[in-house]
């Protein structure tokens, strides 16, 4: 939790859990995974909304894992605004952040998976996103308002 800096098992009543949730841990086959949110990643020199690490709860070290570039599996941008009029602006800022992430890792000779999650995706930006997905520039994109897409995104992360 944000308050105690300790790992907790999931409570039965998860109402309002997002206020204290900083990271989620699980085991995928033989791999340990941590999905964390809103962390400053030093190599990128910026806060990143969605961060997936290859590590255990102990290895996470209350977020110190951000300095271990080889443990970072995926970084993603989350844009929650639902106003279609602002969707294009969200994509522009999100895409700029994702480009910054890829460039920072490229300077270190590393590849990084990236994702874009948004509550509003309009036609023009959908075409740009699709082209990036086809080229492999962007690893995954999803619309938060489409349940099937959100489930697919969660499955992609879980199986990473």
Predicted regions, residues:
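Catalytic core segments in nucleotide and nucleic-acid processing enzymes
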Residues: 7-160
């Amino acid at each position: 939790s944000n308050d105690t800096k300790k790992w907790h098992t999931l409570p039965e009543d998860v109402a309002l859990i997002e206020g204290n949730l900083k990271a989620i841990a699980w085991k995928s086959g033989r791999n340990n995974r941590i999905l964390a949110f809103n962390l400053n990643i030093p190599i990128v020199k910026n806060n990143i909304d969605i961060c997936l690490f290859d590590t255990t709860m102990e290895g996470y070290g209350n977020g110190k894992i951000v300095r271990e570039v080889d443990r970072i599996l995926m970084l993603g941008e989350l844009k929650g605004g639902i106003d279609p009029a602002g969707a294009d602006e969200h994509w522009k800022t999100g895409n700029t952040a994702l480009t910054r992430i890829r460039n920072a890792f490229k300077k270190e000779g590393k590849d990084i998976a990236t994702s874009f999650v948004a509550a509003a995706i309009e036609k023009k930006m959908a075409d740009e996103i699709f082209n990036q997905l086809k080229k492999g520039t962007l690893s995954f994109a999803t619309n938060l308002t489409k349940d099937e897409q959100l489930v697919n995104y969660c499955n992609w992360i879980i199986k990473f």
